[in-house]
Amino acid sequence: MTTELNQGEQFVADFRANAAALTTANAYNPEDEHDACGVGFIAAIDGKPRRSVVEKGIEALKAVWHRGAVDADGKTGDGAGIHVAVPQKFFKDHVKVIGHRAPDNKLAVGQVFLPRISLDAQEACRCIVETEILAFGYYIYGWRQVPINVDIIGEKANATRPEIEQIIVGNNKGVSDEQFELDLYIIRRRIEKAVKGEQINDFYICSLSARSIIYKGMFLAEQLTTFYPDLLDERFESDFAIYHQRYSTNTFPTWPLAQPFRMLAHNGEINTVKGNVNWMKAHETRMEHPAFGTHMQDLKPVIGVGLSDSGSLDTVFEVMVRAGRTAPMVKMMLVPQALTSSQTTPDNHKALIQYCNSVMEPWDGPAALAMTDGRWVVGGMDRNGLRPMRYTITTDGLIIGGSETGMVKIDETQVIEKGRLGPGEMIAVDLQSGKLYRDRELKDHLATLKPWDKWVQNTTHLDELVKTASLKGEPSDMDKAELRRRQQAFGLTMEDMELILHPMVEDGKEAIGSMGDDSPIAVLSDKYRGLHHFFRQNFSQVTNPPIDSLRERRVMSLKTRLGNLGNILDEDETQTRLLQLESPVLTTAEFRAMRDYMGDTAAEIDATFPVDGGPEALRDALRRIRQETEDAVRGGATHVILTDEAMGPARAAIPAILATGAVHTHLIRSNLRTFTSLNVRTAEGLDTHYFAVLIGVGATTVNAYLAQEAIAERHRRGLFGSMPLEKGMANYKKAIDDGLLKIMSKMGISVISSYRGGGNFEAIGLSRALVAEHFPAMVSRISGIGLNGIQKKVLEQHATAYNEEVVALPVGGFYRFRKSGDRHGWEGGVIHTLQQAVTNDSYTTFKKYSEQVNKRPPMQLRDLLELRSTKAPVPVDEVESITAIRKRFITPGMSMGALSPEAHGTLNVAMNRIGAKSDSGEGGEDPARFRPDKNGDNWNSAIKQVASGRFGVTAEYLNQCRELEIKVAQGAKPGEGGQLPGFKVTEMIARLRHSTPGVMLISPPPHHDIYSIEDLAQLIYDLKQINPDAKVTVKLVSRSGIGTIAAGVAKANADIILISGNSGGTGASPQTSIKFAGLPWEMGLSEVHQVLTLNRLRHRVRLRTDGGLKTGRDIVIAAMLGAEEFGIGTASLIAMGCIMVRQCHSNTCPVGVCVQDDKLRQKFVGTPEKVVNLFTFLAEEVREILAGLGFRSLNEVIGRTDLLHQVSRGAEHLDDLDLNPRLAQVDPGENARYCTLQGRNEVPDTLDARIVADARPLFEEGEKMQLAYNARNTQRAIGTRLSSMVTRKFGMFGLQPGHITIRLRGTAGQSLGAFAVQGIKLEVMGDANDYVGKGLSGGTIVVRPTTSSPLETNKNTIIGNTVLYGATAGKLFAAGQAGERFAVRNSGATVVVEGCGSNGCEYMTGGTAVILGRVGDNFAAGMTGGMAYVYDLDDSLPLYINDESVIFQRIEVGHYESQLKHLIEEHVTETQSRFAAEILNDWAREVTKFWQVVPKEMLNRLEVPVHLPKAISAE
């Protein structure tokens, strides 16, 4: 008999079947899942349990529902839960009811998820649990069925719901509470291993403790107490509560992944988790502690399979607590404050942080943490302060902390403090002593626990030694002939020397390039490519942010520790007996000095192999170096040196990356890696990508000796002018260091110790077996060449170097087309044919172009695929029309700034003529374009881009489009920001970007309002409020794991997801980013389509792709891999006249396409007709291909990878590739393989729905109005929909200021007043959350405490993080402090606040900021416009300011004093701030305490000079 499944059960069955098929096909990895959330804690400061703590914890959890995600069924959440003390009375009463006498001491309770479907498995699990508890001699009172209400959860959640029971355990042995907890921890770990040994799934212990218990599951936050009625019982009392609402990137309901975990709840993402997990494998082999005794092996592996990043952090946190450290100390060890962050860090704190960094690699990434070990309750923040953590302290002795303020309703008269945690900070309650510790006091307490300052003196700092050696002179030992041979052996060219090496030596910076990478990926190239070419850099997007390695250098570190790392569970002075360097990059003199210092503690390993050693020579050599290294370490070597110096005619170098990966992995598997450092001397290294790969696979230090010999040889030839050789070497080292920081920062990683060995790359074209053996931290989705293939290539190249009499370096052609070099997609003949076709409107010529592209040897993965169909061809006339197909085309985001105004406008006109869409790119759009010309031509971009710089993003701009695109990343430089040099910022561009002509503009690497997936959901929400008609696109760049990110984006209510390939164009980018970051769109697109289909989300979103599409064949293949829409960027530029000279970044484009120079712009010959011809030809070719395959529309082939198959191209290295993972099919069930949603994915209404209805007299009669409402933190983007209506009815500046006033009482949710326009005034009596005044476009916002509040405004936080991001006009007055990144990228708003957190006024380009109080670290970083005034009572600003781009001085000019005073007066009028009024009351004295902060680039542009001679530097 078959039982019919309900929808939830059917989804679960389909998901499991499809996921298994994809996993088998190597197309999907469940470990790619990400999550984010709302998190918080409540604690009774006196440590006494109260019912109110539980009630307020539940209330707070229900108030962060919008930070989680909800399934389409409206009932299945991504997970929510609460962690409280075990209510002893509740469980002792239960013990009595079941016939036992309740003990006097504490009961322990295990909250257990048991398998529900298999009763045999369920009983087996109970048996294991009981056996392990009894083995430790503890008494079991019995099992308790936890009462639950299954009616309120969704069918999907119910289909995966476990059986939920509690086991009640007595401490009949009478051991101490600490010993009982330790035993219960060991028992739980033994149970987990035993259940796993029985291969039973769906078993999980939420908690097993006498101190605390966790109730969690896959329901919505507001359903917690309905699902678990236990929590409504008055006997449920606690001294703390930790709560969590989860947002996951997949839709499969997994109950154990709900948080809180056993000791912590985490909002954010650990960017370094791959490296941390790898290093824990290395550390745990040495982990011993008396507390665990003989049970140590029961606790390993510490990090189990399938854990999330938060779960992994929790397991490490737990083992370190159980080994005797307190929760605050473990937080310091795992997620430490940045040691380099501030000159204001006390010395005792610095010693503590240095100790922590010596013992552990930091777990780095956005993290708001709520933690408990049963005694301590701790709130903590990551080193960058990338998540919000607000707290409130009340008169009745409660502290309430969490992701938002206002989660719990508190009478303002009972609030004694409102604060926030800044970067690296903590706040904690010691429940045992009943004491609250703020950050400084807590770290002072930790600093007294051990003599950290003495211990850290054991570390030997080598820098002085190695730098002294370098200053004495850099050796140059190699003759020119040997230099040339070695360069040739590694495939180096003149292009490498001149285009890559020379700028690094001359300027200390990486080489910059432009346009995209149109050369073949390494495995498809017929030229020799070093092994580093097979590794593509990973980067952050959406689920965690990249960081700015230039402007936020203070939180980053290349500090490198060398030696024996010891046992991380110890706490003694031996752990700091290490060597330390400031950077892992060493010149030859430095390396030799370090080697001499190491003496007998170092062992050198020859990393070469005989050229005549037979087909297994390389494999044998790898076996040898692994064994020699193991023997050396077992023999006591604490430093290993791998070197290829022995190469010569008879011996070839093992690629250093392969040697390093092999040795690093072998040492981990042999339990030896933490005993030694792994130092590499290689002739192969040249650019920053190479160093990053080498360190990423495990190298401790690197010396690229051949690069140094090349520099010396070029220096002898006088190619660096009068520059001393040592200066050139120092510049090269600086360029590599800065490049490493940039590559780390793309992943959001701040510390190289957490990057090392993390394998933050994807291998493209290397065999899975090779990668699994030597680079197990990486993925290789499409396989490729193995050791034999590598050996063959290495020996062929080696022969060209050593079998010839004289060796001259080849010219090259990897970066720019050369006849003797690598093939390029846009060769001269191809460009010429395409331009001929569009100029002459000749489809015949276009077909010749298409044949040129399609018939050449493979260059891209799609070139290895052929189309196939079993259907009979149909007449072309029956296929969907050219007009319909053309509407699927897009010209991708190219800004006015990158493009000339003529080129930008031509694309817009052309795309509008054919009903397609052009993308404005970053940088705003001229309002003159918003209305068609007299001849009907429409110069307006149909897609408006919202990028990280938010240049020109106003309410008007956002309302003049059909689509809004959030550019998270760019194909040519994912994980990076950008900058428009001053010489490109013309009068027109400055006007559009709300900046100053001639002044450089910086786009940050991340969106400062997208640090996680729920932040993206909030931005999408904001954009759908400001434009109620436009669809929202999210632009991602292809990388492994992008499928799960896209699933999260779809759940965030995006309408379109754009997958950009690595070969897309750019106006300017580091060459190593263009060449080595991101993946081909074929890989990302197919993965996204597969995972969206797997999660039953595909029919809700449209998929778009771009990045090197050239022909109709490319478009059809893209459709079969899942795309519905297609971006054609470079080809459209070529149609307008681009000839690919790759000078976009230098403002010298000879054909007027990518240039702002007036004379060169006149050379532009592009026309809308040429662009229209291109898209017409592409559409016609698509029709012909579809007809030949027997299909009548593109929709019929979308997602039909069965119509593609991989074909042999007759080359062994190509046939090793396996594209089948990209062609794997997912059964879509009842849904289509493409988007069937009409309209857009709508978001819930905000308070504005009521406001707009109540404001009818304004819109109908133009009446001046005042409206009043109560506000809650769940009401987001208040005023934004109103702004949209005002903009559309009256224009952005059509109303007088204050025409409509909205008065709010309470706590405003995120994005208060986002994009508010002139005429709107928002007054809040209470406080507000993050993103206040985002994109403010002329409106006024006032935030002040209620009149009944006893708080001193200047000492309390009133608004959140990232205030006035991208604001272009308007005013903000806040009577209190702002959070981190206050006024980031402010372009024109005026603001007065009473203090701010770190990174204030970062990237500011306009407007005026007055800060009546202390600022945080790194103030004014990257500030190039506007002005700031800082009230400084203790002359501390010089310690906090980043003065690279600004000067600061006391106010010397009456004009500026008057401006400042007027703004403070206005602030007092609006907020009634007593503190600001006191400043005005003694103005003559108080004005002397202000600093005036002015960007250097603005000094000669100010109408009123600031008396520069008085300016001082932070130094």
From Swiss-Prot:
E.C. number(s) listed in UniProt: 1.4.1.13
Note: Glutamine binds to the large subunit and transfers the amido group to 2-oxo-glutamate that apparently binds to the small subunit.
Residues given in the record as [3Fe-4S] cluster binding sites: 1138, 1144, 1149
Residue positions assigned to the propeptide: 1-36
Organism: Azospirillum brasilense
Note on cofactor: Binds 1 [3Fe-4S] cluster.
Iron in keyword set: yes
Reactions this protein catalyses: 2 L-glutamate + NADP(+) = L-glutamine + 2-oxoglutarate + NADPH + H(+)
Subunit structure as annotated in this protein's UniProt entry: Aggregate of 4 catalytic active heterodimers, consisting of a large and a small subunit.
Record protein name field: Glutamate synthase [NADPH] large chain
Cofactor(s) listed: [3Fe-4S] cluster; FAD; FMN
Positions of FMN binding: 1085-1142
Stated family: Belongs to the glutamate synthase family.
Pathway the protein takes part in: Amino-acid biosynthesis; L-glutamate biosynthesis via GLT pathway; L-glutamate from 2-oxoglutarate and L-glutamine (NADP(+) route): step 1/1; Energy metabolism; nitrogen metabolism
Bias (Basic and acidic residues): 926-936
CDD domains: gltB_C, GltS, GltS_FMN
